Amino acid sequence: MDGTEIAVSPRSLHSELMCPICLDMLKNTMTTKECLHRFCSDCIVTALRSGNKECPTCRKKLVSKRSLRPDPNFDALISKIYPSREEYEAHQDRVLIRLSRLHNQQALSSSIEEGLRMQAMHRAQRVRRPIPGSDQTTTMSGGEGEPGEGEGDGEDVSSDSAPDSAPGPAPKRPRGGGAGGSSVGTGGGGTGGVGGGAGSEDSGDRGGTLGGGTLGPPSPPGAPSPPEPGGEIELVFRPHPLLVEKGEYCQTRYVKTTGNATVDHLSKYLALRIALERRQQQEAGEPGGPGGGASDTGGPDGGGGEGGGAGGGDGPEEPALPSLEGVSEKQYTIYIAPGGGAFTTLNGSLTLELVNEKFWKVSRPLELCYAPTKDPK
């Protein structure tokens, strides 16, 4: 020994003193007799007992423990390099704990950031969703089986005094040549001046007052749309084929509303619409009423209708306009025919979404029938 010192890097030193099985510093070193690979005593004995009768490093055959021998010289070398084995192991445990804690904190922070990012993305998608003019709007057009040609289908029954509150243009709907128009005699009397028959609708001259309606108040312009718990329901509203006579006021209506609207809402809406349309029909016949003169397009006596006359004082008295205050959802009953031609009366508290799921169950607009209630209470 001449006292020569050789510098060895900690990395290479650690690889020489490490057990290939537990990847820790060798303890009670055992060396194979044939290939001279070193392992911890407990590690190699456990490997042999598990049935793996070969060297874990080079796969050379190891019959039993007799193929191993202890290596006290290597243990002495390790004790020279690391005099305090317990201190080294304690330091190693502290490093592992610190690394584990740091890794857990990083994983937690990354998880929180990912959650915040996903929430922000979903929130932005909800904000960017297109806002219609009013989510509670019911789109309706008149006709005897086809949508009528109403030029302004967006009247709000519940707020007639604020027509400017409806924002934006209405969505386009299919137009058909149904019997939705009405002809008004310009020189007619009180009853003979209206020539549209049952189901007529003066939607063009009234600017959309008969074309549509809502089941609730409209949303102001720019306001966020209210939540839609039940989505939207499209339905076809027809008169009852057995309970509604042809001479009565009846027409097919096409309605689009929210799924949380009830059958009572539809009944009240229908009563309001029919009362309003009858009132406007009577208003359209006022030019030929009492006191009205002859017209070029009227009858030979200038009356233009059954109740009109050349002199205003001799004609029948003008009937009073129907009031909208007494309108009730009890005036009309709603029916549904799930199949087989049998009509079922719907309870007023049922929502349209529940009716669609319980009675309809087909992929086309919900079809309902209406008829005047015989004994409204």
From Swiss-Prot:
SMART domains: RING
Chain positions with Phosphoserine modification: S9, S111, S158, S161, S200, S203, S219, S225
Key word 4Fe-4S present: no
InterPro entries: RAWUL, RING1/RING2, Znf_RING, Znf_RING/FYVE/PHD, Znf_RING_CS
Record-level Gene Ontology MF annotations: chromatin binding; ubiquitin protein ligase activity; zinc ion binding
Keyword Metal-binding: yes
CDD domains xrefs: RAWUL_RING1, RING-HC_RING2
Segments for region (Necessary for transcriptional repression): 1-205
UniProt keywords, alphabetically: Chromatin regulator, Metal-binding, Nucleus, Phosphoprotein, Repressor, Transcription, Transcription regulation, Transferase, Ubl conjugation pathway, Zinc, Zinc-finger
Motif (Nuclear localization signal): 172-175
Pro residues composition-biased segments: 217-229
Zinc finger (RING-type): 19-59
Bias type Gly residues, positions: 176-199, 206-215, 286-314
Acidic residues bias spans: 146-158
PANTHER family, sorted: E3 UBIQUITIN-PROTEIN LIGASE RING1, E3 UBIQUITIN-PROTEIN LIGASE RING1 / RING 2 FAMILY MEMBER
Known function: Constitutes one of the E3 ubiquitin-protein ligases that mediate monoubiquitination of 'Lys-119' of histone H2A, thereby playing a central role in histone code and gene regulation. H2A 'Lys-119' ubiquitination gives a specific tag for epigenetic transcriptional repression and participates in X chromosome inactivation of female mammals. Essential component of a Polycomb group (PcG) multiprotein PRC1-like complex, a complex class required to maintain the transcriptionally repressive state of many genes, including Hox genes, throughout development.
Protein name (database record): E3 ubiquitin-protein ligase RING1
The encoding gene: RING1
